[in-house]
């Protein structure tokens, strides 16, 4: 007869990736395991909402590429309309990201993680970004999802690029409590100039659902008085096939060029609304930063802003 087992109660979240019972070392599978493919697509709307001093919103349909940096040759053989390192209808070039110092992107990214104290122990690095379309690309933000060998998310790198082609990577190790069943919550102080209408004394609050069947990216930018700007992307995963690429490029032709044009068009609209211009300070001396999480400013206002933004996005998406 087997001994009776005492009621163990609820499992404890240990490090944001694994759950274990009190007094036990056994671990359940990690939260949000990454897709197994070398590359896939995420399709959906991106929305920006300026909250003050003037209200301003826009929404565009886009598609992003999720690619395994250790499996670039395999990804490049997936379909005829997609290539790695050479021109095609849709393509990916390593030099469009990271420090672009001639090394393999995965190598330089692992070094950046090591400098932040993150060792993936043979795990994977998946990059979510806009690909080149007919040779042109621009990525306002690209995210590196960094997993250990067990598939647990250990860090995210938020790579921000402005229209001056200045680039900075915010390296964010996943700390205890940041990753839960609701997703990932992180924050960082703003270091690099991005917009002529946004001051530098600001904080980014990242609320993410890591890539799986879906991906959700939500960024709330706040100044000392409260939320100023939100940006969201809600993507559904699609296979990287010739048919999917052909349909997406037909539906959103010259997508990456339109992203750059849209940034300047929306900036003109903000200027016409009377927003003051902000001086452009020098770019950060370092290509990446691993500062501590930024302060959570005006949490109640942030929650209200997220509810309003999310409700608006859902209404637009359902139309």
Give a label for each model feature.
Residues 2-3, 18-319:
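Mature, function-bearing regions of proteins
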């Amino acid at each position: 007869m087997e001994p009776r087992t005492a009621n163990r109660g609820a499992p404890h979240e240990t490090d944001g990736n694994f759950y274990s019972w009190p007094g036990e070392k056994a671990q359940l599978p990690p939260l949000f395991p990454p897709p197994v493919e070398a590359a896939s697509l995420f399709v959906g709307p991106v929305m920006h909402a300026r909250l003050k001093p003037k209200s301003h919103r826009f929404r565009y349909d886009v598609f992003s590429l999720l690619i395994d940096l250790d499996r670039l040759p395999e990804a490049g053989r997936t379909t005829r309309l997609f290539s790695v390192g050479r021109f095609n209808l849709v393509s990916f070039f390593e030099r469009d990201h990271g420090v672009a110092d001639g090394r393999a992107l995965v190598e330089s990214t692992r070094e950046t993680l090591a400098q932040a104290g993150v060792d993936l122990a043979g795990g994977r690095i998946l990059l979510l970004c806009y690909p080149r379309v007919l040779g042109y690309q621009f990525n306002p933000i690209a995210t590196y999802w960094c997993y250990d060998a067990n598939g647990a998310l250990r860090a995210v790198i938020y790579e921000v690029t402005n229209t001056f082609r200045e680039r900075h990577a915010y390296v964010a190790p996943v700390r205890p409590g940041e990753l839960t069943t609701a997703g990932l919550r992180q924050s960082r102080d703003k270091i690099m100039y991005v917009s002529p209408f946004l001051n530098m004394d600001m904080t980014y609050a990242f609320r993410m659902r890591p890539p799986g069947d879906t991906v959700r990216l939500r960024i709330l930018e706040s100044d000392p008085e409260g939320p100023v700007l939100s940006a969201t992307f809600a993507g559904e995963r699609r296979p990287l096939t010739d048919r999917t690429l052909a349909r997406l490029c037909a539906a959103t032709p010259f997508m990456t060029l339109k992203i750059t044009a849209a940034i300047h068009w929306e900036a003109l609209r903000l200027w016409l609304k009377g927003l003051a211009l902000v001086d452009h300070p020098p770019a950060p001396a370092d290509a990446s930063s691993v500062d501590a999480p930024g302060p959570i400013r005006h949490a109640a206002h942030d929650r209200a802003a997220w509810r309003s933004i999310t409700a608006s996005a859902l209404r637009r998406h359902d139309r």
